Amino acid sequence: MTRVKRGYVARKRRKRVLQLTQGFRGAHSVLFRTANQQNIKALRYASRDRARRKRDFRRLWITRINAGARKQGLSYSQLMHRFKKCGILINRKVLAQLALLDTKTFNQLVFYTDL
């Protein structure tokens, strides 16, 4: 049987994994086996946290809207009910930015729902 010269195939594969784990602490960026395990774990966390990030931002927006609404003497749910009843279709992200950065406009929107 003839000898198979693999050349740089294994080195290339290991180098690719080690490049992905640059910046990890300790052996996780130096030793191939632990680096490979950490890379798999990091990818798993990344896919999980993409969904979690959407949840977290929605939660933050609701908290900010609630804070702005309570300054007007309303709860978050009462405010959103009024918006829906009046046909105001502004998403939570924009409402949160208004409540945080442009309180005058946010207060006018809340006042408009009273009419």
UniProtKB/Swiss-Prot annotation:
| Claim: Ubl conjugation is one of the keywords in the record | no
Q: What is its main location?
A: plastid
Q: Which CDD domains match?
A: Ribosomal_L20
InterPro entries linked to this entry: Ribosomal_bL20, RIBOSOMAL_L20_CS, Ribosomal_protein_bL20_C
This protein's source sits in the domain of life called Eukaryota
What PROSITE patterns does UniProt report for this protein, alphabetically? RIBOSOMAL_L20
Q: Where in the cell is it found?
A: Plastid, Chloroplast
Q: Which GO terms describe its molecular function?
A: rRNA binding; structural constituent of ribosome
Record keywords: Chloroplast, Plastid, Ribonucleoprotein, Ribosomal protein, RNA-binding, rRNA-binding
Q: State the GO CC annotations.
A: chloroplast; ribonucleoprotein complex; ribosome
Q: Which Pfam families match?
A: Ribosomal_L20 (PF00453)
Leader sequence range is none
Record GO biological process: ribosomal large subunit assembly; translation
What is the stated purpose of this protein? Binds directly to 23S ribosomal RNA and is necessary for the in vitro assembly process of the 50S ribosomal subunit. It is not involved in the protein synthesizing functions of that subunit.
The family database entries (NCBIfam families) matched by this protein are listed as:
rplT_bact (TIGR01032)
Q: Which PANTHER family match?
A: 39S RIBOSOMAL PROTEIN L20
UniProt record similarity statement: Belongs to the bacterial ribosomal protein bL20 family.
The protein's name is Large ribosomal subunit protein bL20c
**Record lineage:** Eukaryota, Viridiplantae, Streptophyta, Chlorokybophyceae, Chlorokybales
